[in-house]
């Protein structure tokens, strides 16, 4: 939508979007998943995210209109992503039998779908003042004494059972 495309986003819980985009976006229409059976319009590109099964009515519209059907998978750095990105996934049964979905794997390497980012991200990064941000948001909340150098860790993961123990162990090791 940021690039000028119209987007219809079908969701089962639109409350989940409130914190991400409380004001919405003029090019994004949010629709209830439960209403998908009643739609008569389908986009030129349909993105099925994370293996969610589309209603038969929607699959039929995709096949009838000839929409590009993308099967969006999770971001991964695993080696199979390079082998699987862009492969056809033939529909074997149902309303779109014989039609192809196309695997799309976001990833970090050339040969994957890459990473989508805001159009102004590089400009914002180049003007970001890390020291000012740290002084404003991190250091006032810190209990470390001024002589110790903090250990900065970026952690991106699902929340495993051992995460709390890991964080506590890190905190006690200072």
Model-identified regions with their sequence ranges:
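Active-site and donor-binding regions of nucleotide-sugar-utilizing enzymes
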Residues: 1-98
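A generic structural signal for short, solvent-exposed coil/turn residues
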Residues: 22, 97, 145, 172-173
